[in-house]
Amino acid sequence: MDRAVNRVVLENEEREAKNTWRLVFRIAVLLLMVMTLAISAAALVYSMGASTPRDLAGISTVISKTEDKVTSLLSSKQDVIDRIYKQVALESPLALLNTESIIMNAITSLSYQINGAANNSGCGEPVHDPDYIGGIGKELIVDDISDVTSFYPSAYQEHLNFIPAPTTGSGCTRIPSFDMSTTHYCYTHNVILSGCRDHSHSHQYLALGVLRTSATGRVFFSTLRSINLDDTQNRKSCSVSATPLGCDMLCSKVTETEEEDYKSVTPTSMVHGRLGFDGQYHEKDLDTTVLFKDWVANYPGVGGGSFIDDRVWFPVYGGLKPNSPSDTAQEGKYVIYKRYNNTCPDEQDYQIRMAKSSYKPGRFGGKRVQQAILSIKVSTSLGEDPVLTIPPNTITLMGAEGRVLTVGTSHFLYQRGSSYFSPALLYPMTVNNKTATLHSPYTFNAFTRPGSVPCQASARCPNSCITGVYTDPYPLIFHRNHTLRGVFGTMLDDEQARLNPVSAVFDNISRSRVTRVSSSSTKAAYTTSTCFKVVKTNKAYCLSIAEISNTLFGEFRIVPLLVEILKDDRV
């Protein structure tokens, strides 16, 4: 609706501007015609009565005076034209931005009052500070000319840490998931009390908050609602998404190890939950026996979901039941993606054979590990109208953790490099009638992940692997035609080990100068990144939520790393 209103306003402004210029042109032409007639008449009169050179000299005097009048009139009209241009080109856009800020502030105030009255809690729907209006979920840098790698991250900035950390040596916080809408952000992670390798019991921390600007102009994330789901349910692999009703979350309910789950014949239980703006959490079990009837194991992709067309879209992956309709539909399908300027030397037939085998790794008993996308209607009823899309393996690699993102009008699926292909992948995604279609991906050759041989960071040939680590890229730089040019992200810059986290801006081939968390021996794991802009200052920032090793309190500490995106004009 906002987009339609903006389009109407712009069309009206363009129509008014055209009418104004047309009127100015007509007045100028009319004045010139009148002056021409006056000059002609004066010349005729003088020529008829002229008898001496002095009489003829008077004609030039009249003409000169007339020219002065015309020049004076045109100058006054030029002032009008200049004022019109200033109004249309400079002042009107600023006035519109101020009006938008006023409207958003009014909506914020009304939402607090209306929601507070409705739930008797005094709590309403939160909204980011006005400084961020137009700077969230947008194409932040539109540039056809500059080298992508001339943009680079600043040093990490000190800001309010909104993520709880372990409080004992045996505590474990892992698997962060983050999503941010134009009104609020959502964050979740898993909490294990007895070490990160315990699969039997865990808590799930879920929070809702907004972006604020301090009195000194610093960015900070303000948590407004949070809950620790500490019950008998063992929620795992959760993905979160910011929706108009709060924070929607999709989790699997796990009672066994991943390997045991793939050996089973029934799908994994899943739950759709929501933390509302009133701080209350509700959830509903999905009917996986119908929705995932062809699956033996199914998990959310860990990365954030996205709200698109009144539905929330989550990444999903898992194992297909052998010879089921979904499994049969993928039989013989494969795709081979190649490294930039680094061709695999293996024979083509061998590459194809290895690519096909990569979808059925031995670790999971030869089950086909499949990518999928689950969409659920967002309404006051949870788990409403779920629809599962299984993309063809002629587009996607072996199923893996992932994230669904929306930037501007474009949608993407990030797929973790769990298989042989190391560079980060972003599949363009289109949605229609509750289902999604994926297209050939953008690849970022220098944005790699560590992995075990033969699928290490520098690998270039198809192989069967379960490796890698989740490190998603965020679309940052676009062409004017809305195609993607560059991304921001935090990668683990090592061949095989989960070491050396660095943040950078990446194009399809190379990367910018990097910002390092610490030394190259620093242990790390998952990272998820999101970028936004403070419109008031026109500064772009990126947040990388990263699992960093923590030797004293727990194995990992989840740290929100904040950078400003700078530009080196010398590049």
Swiss-Prot record:
Keywords: Disulfide bond, Glycoprotein, Hemagglutinin, Host cell membrane, Host membrane, Host-virus interaction, Hydrolase, Membrane, Signal-anchor, Transmembrane, Transmembrane helix, Viral attachment to host cell, Viral envelope protein, Virion, Virus entry into host cell. GO terms for biological process: symbiont entry into host cell; virion attachment to host cell. It is found in: Virion membrane; Host cell membrane. Residues 48-571 are virion surface. One of its GO terms (cellular component) is virion membrane. It holds the Pfam family HN. Glycans are attached at residues 119, 341, 433, 481, 508, 538. GO terms for molecular function: exo-alpha-sialidase activity; host cell surface receptor binding. Its EC number is 3.2.1.18. Disulfide bonds join 172-196, 186-247, 238-251, 344-461, 455-465, 531-542. It catalyses: Hydrolysis of alpha-(2->3)-, alpha-(2->6)-, alpha-(2->8)- glycosidic linkages of terminal sialic acid residues in oligosaccharides, glycoproteins, glycolipids, colominic acid and synthetic substrates. The C-terminus (head domain) is involved in binding the cellular receptor. Belongs to the paramyxoviruses hemagglutinin-neuraminidase family. This is Hemagglutinin-neuraminidase. The lineage of its organism: Viruses, Riboviria, Orthornavirae, Negarnaviricota, Haploviricotina. The gene is HN.
